[in-house]
Amino acid sequence: MSRIVLVLALLLPGAAAAETRPLPVPPAVPDRPAPAPMTEPPAQTPGTVTGRPLPRFASLRASEINLRAGPGTRFPVEWTYTRAGLPVEIVREFDTWRRIRDMDGVEGWVQQARLAPRRTFLVRGGAATLRRAPDEGAAAVAELAPGVIGTIRRCEAASAWCEVSVAGARGFLRREAMWGVYPGEEVR
């Protein structure tokens, strides 16, 4: 059986196979270590604007999105995200602005129109194996490199596995290998 190794360069539009450049990483936030993987779903409260639960996951709609210090264009840009589909957590709402948090714990404000409800994930830690069935003994479909982004198709609340797709490959990935879904969360 052949294994496909998906690398970040293959997922970026226009990236040459022979030329792989690391993506910029947001600056480290002093006095705030990167969050540890969650073991329980967070307590949720209704958003003040939409009434939808907070926190909740969304994804970046465009390949260039400014993260601002506050909810408005008068606030300075602190960072520019350059990866469409990147999963983020919406942690607060104000008018048409959403305070988001990325996998590294960096927070800031973006316009709601720059976010999509599409559920995506980011492979965290080391390489992760995409399996044909939700079982460690199932055949491998692909090896996913750290930082690869994919789409969450569904997650059963009681399952340690989620059905996902990445660059045309479809299979099952353990929740602990991805960032973009809460422990015990059901995604349909």
Regions found by a protein language model. Name each.
Residues 73:
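A short, aromatic/hydrophobic, helix- or strand-capping loop or linear motif
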Residues 76-77:
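Beta-strand-rich domains and repeat architectures in extracellular enzymes and scaffolds
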Residues 21-69, 80-84, 91-94, 101-134, ...:
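SH3-family beta-barrel domains
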Residues 5-13:
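Bacterial N-terminal signal peptides
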Residues 16-20:
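Boundary at the C-terminal end of the N-terminal hydrophobic targeting segment
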Residues 2-6, 129:
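N-terminal low-complexity, intrinsically disordered tails enriched in Ser/Pro/Gly
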